[in-house]
Amino acid sequence: MNIIFMGTPAYARTILDALVRAGIGVAGVFTQPDKPVGRKQILTPSEVKIYAQQNLPHAKIFQPKTLKEGTVAAEILALKPDFIVVAAYGKILPKSVLDIAPCINLHASILPKYRGASPIQAALLNGEKNTGVTAMLMDEGLDTGDMLGFTHVSCEGKRSAEMFEILGELAGELAVKTLFDFKNLTPQKQDDALATHCKKIQKSDGLVNLSEDAEQIYNKFRAFHEWPGVFLESGLKFLELNLAEGSGAAGEILRIEKDGFVVACGTGALKILALQEAGKKALDAKAYINGKRLVAGNKIS
């Protein structure tokens, strides 16, 4: 079996590794162009490119700005793939590519729920108890293709980084199973009436207000823990928090405990364990409280 793999982040790298370990031949790898990262804007390759360079010496690596470039379809065709496997690639596949071989996407939700760019974060943001991965035959729509298989998993109490790892492993297993069983699978249409969508995450999505429900803020924290984090309009960022018991005026410090402090929200309360003011170093909650000389009854803003 000979495939082309298209993907970019660690989630995709995990899937690619599962395919390689299963003995599936990878003729080519498509990934996003290297991007400037950090304050020094150092040009950095994707996780998938790093993996391919280290483990796939015979695979061609492609980093086109768009798959609509004139030579892309011809280059793919020349590699004679049996399948094109796609996972969090971040680019639209045009019809000229979709027509070359069956294109199978490993989407990190149970479709038709959470079509779009951020399905893992969306599941956590909405307080879902379970999520999963769908293997799907790609078409020209956004995550609208016929489904080939599913894997379900609990996401209760988990954060985005943990779910990316868990779902990457499950997606790798599902990808291998789907390719080897492909001829025996019956594609299943999605019910568009049940479809929900999720968007690309922006930094502004991490903005919270303590007048919100505590559970809503907690779910934002779980979803955006990796990036962009959760922060108040003042720039104060919550680095570690949990749900807590208590009620009071939004932003009021209800009590100070050994390892943190409890603050009231619009409904419910949160225990803050670590935080960071804009432009300053991260602090544990106790150091922050002592430095600001805050006591129960004071407000956080």
Curated annotation (Swiss-Prot):
Molecular function GO labels: methionyl-tRNA formyltransferase activity
Residues that hold (6S)-5,6,7,8-tetrahydrofolate according to the record: 109-112
Pfam family, any one: Formyl_trans_N
EC number(s) from the headed UniProt entry: 2.1.2.9
Keywords: Protein biosynthesis, Transferase
GO terms under cellular component: cytosol
Keyword Transferase assigned: yes
Cross-referenced InterPro entries: Fmt, Formyl_trans_C, Formyl_trans_C_sf, Formyl_transf_N, Formyl_transf_N_sf, Formyl_transferase-like_C_sf, Met-tRNA-FMT_C, Met-tRNA-FMT_N
Protein family according to the UniProt entry: Belongs to the Fmt family.
Function comment: Attaches a formyl group to the free amino group of methionyl-tRNA(fMet). The formyl group appears to play a dual role in the initiator identity of N-formylmethionyl-tRNA by promoting its recognition by IF2 and preventing the misappropriation of this tRNA by the elongation apparatus.
NCBIfam families per UniProt: fmt
Protein name: Methionyl-tRNA formyltransferase
The species this protein was found in: Campylobacter curvus (strain 525.92)
Gene: fmt
